[in-house]
Amino acid sequence: MRPDLAQQIEAGCAVVTPNRRLANHLKHEYDTRQIQAGRPAWPTADILPLSAFVERAYGDALYSGHAAGLPLLLAPSQEQALWESIIRDADGTLLAVPEAAALVREAWQLAHAWGLLPRLNKFPLNEDGRAFQNWAQRYESISRRERHTDGARLADVVASLLAKAEIRKPKSLIHYGFDRVMPQQADFFEALTVAGCEVTGAGPGPRGGERLRLACADSTEEIRRAAAWARARLEADATARIGIVVPELAKHRKAIRRIFSAVMEPDYALPGNRHPAFPFNISLGEPLSSYPLVNAAFLALELAGREIDFEHASRLIRSPFLGGADSEITRRARLDTQLRERAEPVVTLDRLLTLIAQDDAGCPILVQRLTAFAGFRKARLFGRQSPSAWARGISEALAVIGFPGERGLDSVEFQAHGKWHELLADFAALDRVLPRAGYGDAVSRLRRMAVDTLFQPETPAVPIQVLGEFEATGMEFDHLWVMGLSDESWPPGPRPNPFLPVALQRDAGLPQGSAAGSLELSRRLTGEWLCRAGEVVLSYPRHEDDRELKASPLISAVPEQELALPGYVSYRDAVHRRRQLESSEDAKAPPLAAGAAVGGGTAVIRDHAACPFRAFALHRLGADGLEEPHAGLNALERGTLVHRVLAQAWAHIKTKSALDGTGEDELGALLARAAEEAVARIRRERPTVLSGRFAEIEKRRLVRLARSWLELEKQRGGFTVLATEDKRRMEIGGLSLNARLDRVDETDDGRRIVIDYKTGNAAPGAMLGDRPDEPQLPLYLVSTEPDAAAVAFAQVRAGDMKFAGLARDADILPDARTLPDGKLRQAAPSWAQQVEAWRAGLTRIATGFSAGDARVDPKRYPDTCRYCDVKPFCRIYERLGNTLDEDAE
């Protein structure tokens, strides 16, 4: 801080700044100076943003003898709501009313800050300009009638009162760090001068030192090098003031936080290290709605009012911000996995409670909270109410569900909870500008307010400040890095407000109103950066996506140089460099105990053939992927329905001769009963999956498919169906497996056929090879039906009904392939040899699983891995390289 500025503050001079961050920066600098001077205590410096100074003066007037004629100040949320009401009433066809209102409110603020309203009629107005003029007149009319004012006009209101003795005014005031004083600000300072206050302007003095321009490969490398540079400067001097200026901070915020965190605290992502004390602070806050605590509140509120995505309900169930979350955390996670098997993609609160009641998940606190929440919704959250009434109801509803949870909140959560209460208070204050509304509208508006509220938790003072281009104005640093200064990004393009004439904005000199104004502002900011620190680095990326970039012309005069930086390693690399590594063979699991039961049936063999690790993870460790709730029936469920209908039909018909003798009407009635029972069964399992006419449509589909299939069966010779949906226990390679065999037929001459229904594509080749894709039919053959003369898939598919199988004899089954077959390259020369090949191959696969073979060995990489649930577990990407498509991950 400049010594003369500190002396003036000590003498009682007030300082106003263009933003809160600069005010806090000056306060910190002033307090540090007092500590260094050895003072045990000192008066608080009167340093605050100009907007806060104006509000303080307004507050003095509000509690003085002039309060009776003073307009009441609207909060920003009230302004936004009033503009929305005016626009909605004037133009019922406009869809994006909140977005339009935000731009109109910005136009209103610009018009007052730059004194544009008196000049508005001197410029031709387009449709948007005329709309703004009409809406603004309506806004002013309501303001006069209701005696309102707003942030855009408050400085003018206060300026008219400054001559009053009751209004507190400093003897002297310095406006510090203003890049440009706008007309309204100049009028306010003039009014202060007339009222007897000495007003002067000031800013930080220029500093010399090293200046360089640095080219980086891309924005990621640019951020990484800036982080390494900042850490190096901090390690060299723990008291250094370090600034990182990012013109497009909102765009790069997440990458900056991730990379700076990894460079400053390499172990920040380790479990248990929830909130490390980072030495940097990012000025740009995030929407309040993005904080987990606030998001959980909205998930609960939205579930009370309408159906929501199951994924959102899942997040709510597992949220730590509900009552009993810590006590039931594991059981709630297990409940979530169970609900996914029966839930639809969207759920209501009542439907969610019904689903939970069907599972014995052991979550009594969750059930009690949700039940009470549903009761409160019916008792209180209905009808049309005022915003303040809804605010009370929302607070009470969240209390009923146990928000914000039973565990203690950390610092960020605690501050977010406090900000949530402030948001509810702002919402309650909308009574002044909004009529009564329904619950859904109230929650929607509250969420929009949370999205519009940028929140940055308070942190201790840190040496590294990451700032936007305007926030660095007036601040001094020992080291300053400005990034992103490519020819595409700097200067930024103009952003004129669409509701004000562009010619007016250009004529008035609004910085973002024209290309010339944007260029001039960027030139001034660039010049200021170059004289605000002892060391200044200006960087730019050479590439973005597939485009080549150059340095901005505004920094071309700064010499381009290389910058030597320490090579900070990541936590992973640091571990490897210590060389204290243990090597462990992870391809061998403990063998199965003799007689140990293994679930999964024939899928154990199929999965081990596809990849030994997949079988180990799924069938020994139980590492199943989470189900994705789906609407209606998925392919597996449709196939199950077909299986059940045909199984019931053959359980009644039994023989080919009986099928031939069954009349069309009788057969239709039989299939209709079978379809009815199959649909009823699946509705018991998933009550909402088929209702009303959808159930009837599905029954007709099933009858149609089954009838078409039975017509194909009539083309066969005589046979008897010996078994359908038959439970079998299979012993092979030390494995004992339980499975359900779809069907076994016996021809009139005594030859048996093992059949497996398929509603998708089926091919005999899927049964062949050392690692067959579909081993179930050969497995049934060698373990339970060793004398069978054929195995076949029954492809029950509309328009493509057929048997796809292998047979000893050509006459046993339509379309069955016999051996040798030149087109089946992996088949044995004869049926007997093929059976022995199956027996040997399946025994080898089963023995491998029993012995603990857990190699990561996909049969066909990457196809085998494309839809596998255990990819993160086996780390196939690290082993073989990430060649899977992004959309398949």
Residue map of PLM features:
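Polyanion-engaging groove/track-forming segments
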Residues: M1-D660, E664-D665, E676-E685, V689, ...
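RecB-family 4Fe-4S metal-dependent nuclease core
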Residues: G402, E406, S411, D546, ...
